[in-house]
UniProtKB/Swiss-Prot annotation:
Gene transcribed to yield this protein: rsmH
Organism: Phenylobacterium zucineum (strain HLK1)
UniProt EC number: 2.1.1.199
UniProt cross-references to Pfam families, sorted A to Z: Methyltransf_5 (PF01795)
Protein name: Ribosomal RNA small subunit methyltransferase H
Record-level GO cellular component terms: cytoplasm
Length: 310
C-alpha cells in the first residue's frame, strides 16, 4: 500500500540516522510508514511502534525479515526490545496529517466528527475531558498545552454550556469557542486552534509520553546509536532541547555569585549538530504543515544511562 503523504524532513532524518544493512532502527511513530520505507530502502531493519491500531494496513508488503510493527507507545521501546538493542531511534511527534484528515478521528476543527482525539483505541476521549473536567483544569489545559491566552474565558463558557447539553462533536465545540471569543475578527488562525491543541495533548498525554520516550531511547540505543526527533511546537521542542542539552553535559556555566553547579553523570549523548534544523523553502511550499517542524539529533555515547534522571 502506498504512503498517502511524505513525512516532514524525511531525507534529513534518514541522513542523520545513517541506517545501513545490519543495523536496527526504531521508528517510534510509524503512522503511514513513510520513515520506515525510507529506512528499509537502505537495507537496514526497522522495528516500528504506534499506539494506533488502524495503521497496520500501511505495513502491508513490507519485508517480513527486516520489519516488525509493535502496537504500543514509543515510550515502551526499551521494555519491548531491551537495553542496547537499536542503532537508531526516530520520533516524528504530533498528530499525523492522516489523522487530521480523517474527520471520524475527531482531531480537526475544520471537519465535523466525534469529539475523540485519541491516537490509540483506549482511554478517555476529548469529549470526556471537556464535559467532566473542572473549569480550572480545563483552563490549565488550554493555557499550558495550547498556549491559549483566553483559557479561563473559554473554560468558563464551556462549563456553563455543558450543564445544559454536553459537547459531542468537533465542529460543535469549535463553533462554540469561536462565538465565546467574539468571532474571528481578522485572526490569522481559527479561534479554536490553541484550545484543540491543548485538548489533544492532554488526551494523549503527549508531553509526558515524550519525556518517557526520550529516556527510553537513551536506554535502547547502543553506543554510537543515533536519536532523531522532529517536533512541531515549542512545548515539544523545549523538552527535547533540554533533554539533549543536559544529557550532552551542556549545563549552564555557574555564576561567581552563586554556588558552583554540580556536575551530573558522564554525558550519555553528543549532539550531532548544534541547534535545530528546519525544512527547506521548497518543502514548506509543498507542505505548509512542515513550516514549524524542527529536527534535533544526537549520538549515544558509551556512558551509562542516567538512572537517577527522568
Amino acid at each position: 500500500m502506498t504512503t498517502p503523504h511524505v513525512p516532514v524532513l524525511m531525507q534529513e532524518v534518514v541522513d542523520a540516522l545513517a541506517p545501513a544493512p545490519g543495523r536496527t532502527i526504531i521508528d517510534g511513530t510509524f503512522g503511514a510508514g513513510g520513515y520506515t520505507r525510507a529506512i528499509l530502502a537502505t537495507g537496514a531493519s526497522v522495528v516500528a511502534f504506534d499506539r494506533d491500531p488502524t495503521v497496520r494496513r500501511f505495513a502491508e508488503g513490507l519485508p517480513a525479515d527486516r520489519f516488525r510493527l509493535v502496537e504500543a507507545r514509543f515510550s515502551e521501546m526499551d521494555e519491548v526490545l531491551g537495553e542496547g538493542a537499536a542503532d537508531g531511534v526516530a520520533l516524528d511527534l504530533g498528530v499525523s496529517s492522516m489523522q487530521l484528515d480523517q474527520a471520524e478521528r475527531g482531531f480537526s476543527f475544520m471537519q465535523d466528527g466525534p469529539l475523540d482525539m485519541r491516537m490509540g483505541a483506549s482511554g478517555p476521549t476529548a469529549a470526556d475531558l471537556v464535559n467532566t473536567a473542572e473549569p480550572a483544569e480545563l483552563a490549565r489545559i488550554f493555557f499550558v498545552y495550547g498556549e491559549e491566552r483566553e483559557s479561563r474565558r473559554i473554560a468558563r463558557a464551556i462549563a456553563r454550556r455543558r450543564e445544559e447539553q454536553p459537547f459531542t462533536r468537533t465542529l460543535e465545540l469549535a463553533d462554540f469557542i469561536e462565538k465565546a471569543l467574539g468571532g474571528r475578527r481578522g485572526a490569522k488562525i481559527h479561534p479554536a486552534t490553541r484550545a484543540f491543541q491543548g485538548l489533544r495533548i492532554a488526551v494523549n498525554e503527549e508531553l509526558s509520553e515524550l519525556e518517557a520516550g526520550l529516556a527510553a531511547a537513551e536506554r535502547v540505543l547502543k553506543p554510537e546509536g543515533r536519536l532523531c526527533v522532529v517536533t512541531f511546537h515549542s512545548l515539544e521542542d523545549r523538552i527535547v532541547k533540554s533533554f539533549l542539552s543536559v544529557r550532552a553535559g551542556r549545563t549552564p556555566a555557574g555564576s561567581r555569585h552563586a554556588p558552583p553547579v554540580r556536575q551530573g553523570p558522564a554525558p550519555s549523548f553528543q549532539l550531532l549538530f548544534n541547534g535545530a534544523r528546519g525544512p527547506s523553502e521548497t518543502e514548506v511550499a509543498a507542505n505548509p504543515r512542515a513550516r514549524s517542524a524542527k529536527l534535533r539529533a544526537a549520538v549515544r555515547t558509551d556512558a551509562p544511562v542516567w538512572r537517577d534522571a527522568a
